[in-house]
From Swiss-Prot:
Annotated protein name in UniProt: Calcipressin-3
Record family assignment: Belongs to the RCAN family.
Stretches with biased composition (Polar residues): 7-19
Organism this protein belongs to: Mus musculus
GO molecular function, one term: troponin I binding
Taxonomic path: Eukaryota, Metazoa, Chordata, Craniata, Vertebrata
Stretches for region Disordered: 1-25, 202-239
Amino acid sequence: MLRDSLKSWNDSQSDLCSSDQEEEEEMVFGENEDGLEEMMDLSDLPTSLFACSVHEAVFEVQEQKERFEALFTLYDDQVTFQLFKSFRRVRINFSKPEAAARARIELHESEFHGRKLKLYFAQVQVSGEARDKSYLLPPQPTKQFLISPPASPPVGWKQSEDAMPVINYDLLCAVSKLGPGEKYELHAGTESTPSVVVHVCESETEEEEDTKNPKQKITQTRRPEAPTAALSERLDCAL
């Protein structure tokens, strides 16, 4: 009985271990497949390549040009070429990004007419909408009416009434009664208190400055007198 129970327990443990290993292998293989699919996603790659430092014969000799184009037609039948002779570059346009990637991997730094081909992906042209999505957007203008007033005021807004200006009429009355060189009685005297009188006088500093630095008077330029010789000649002619 004990042997049978031990044997059955060992068999159950082995079955559990094998099932756990199978689940782990399935999880690992599933993750690897997902990672490979992400790695093989070539939709973001450009469909054009640039061949740099191309031999001059490709631009001048038709046979060399056809040989050069034949290297890339193996990957895509609809491939087109744009030759830039002054820069010694050729733009190769494929119909699919997969073909461009294969050509880049297999033909980069391969020899052609005694020189190594340098193949580089062309820059992907990003549209305006996609470019805007790649940056952070400004916050939504929910409560920006204090920064710049809207066309219509917000709900519950009321215009505040301006307060009346504070005017000291007593001060204005006292200033209006003042005159040049006259005295002004602030408080009238009583039997027990003297009166308060203000006398306007010139400051001593202004008088000292006037004596030290007198103002210069501009003398008017005198009109020049007519020469006597010219007057005598005129008198002789008149006589």
